[in-house]
Amino acid sequence: MLKKEWDYVNKILKKIKNIRNLLQDESMYVIIVYDVNVSRVNKIKSFLRKHLNWVQNSVFEGEVTKAEFERIKDGILRIIDEDEDSVIIYQFPLNFMPKREILGLEKNPIDDII
């Protein structure tokens, strides 16, 4: 095989690999609850607002891909002090439909909740 043909084949194989990765990148629904030191509250809140929907104090939720979920976890770990702060992440497959019931005031109504 000529170098030009070999380069073309490698280019096609890379595209196939990228497509395969996209197809395997399933989405999920996550709920993140955090209790962090007051000095880090604004950092974690600002970071999570970029990825998820704010529900109420210290609670975010939304649909994310596996790749985005990993980026969110990495970002959280860069912000928190693991010896002092606590973050709980609930993961649900998209076909799982939990019932959501609000008692009292709904702090931030969202139309497209699971």
UniProtKB/Swiss-Prot annotation:
Source superkingdom: Archaea
Q: What class of enzyme is it?
A: hydrolase
Give one GO term, molecular function aspect. metal ion binding
Concerning CDD domains, the annotation shows:
Cas2_I_II_III (cd09725)
Q: Which residues form a coiled coil?
A: none
- Write the Enzyme Commission number(s) for this entry: 3.1.-.-
Q: Which Gene3D superfamilies match?
A: 3.30.70.240
> What are the entry keywords?
Antiviral defense, Endonuclease, Hydrolase, Magnesium, Metal-binding, Nuclease
Task: List GO BP terms, alphabetically.
Answer: defense response to virus; maintenance of CRISPR repeat elements
Binding of Mg(2+), residues: D35
Please list the cofactors this protein needs: Mg(2+)
Instruction: Give the family from UniProt.
Output: Belongs to the CRISPR-associated endoribonuclease Cas2 protein family.
- Subunit info? Homodimer, forms a heterotetramer with a Cas1 homodimer.
Which NCBIfam families does the annotation name? cas2
Q: What does this protein do?
A: CRISPR (clustered regularly interspaced short palindromic repeat), is an adaptive immune system that provides protection against mobile genetic elements (viruses, transposable elements and conjugative plasmids). CRISPR clusters contain sequences complementary to antecedent mobile elements and target invading nucleic acids. CRISPR clusters are transcribed and processed into CRISPR RNA (crRNA). Functions as a ssRNA-specific endoribonuclease. Involved in the integration of spacer DNA into the CRISPR cassette.
Q: What is the protein name stated in its UniProt record?
A: CRISPR-associated endoribonuclease Cas2
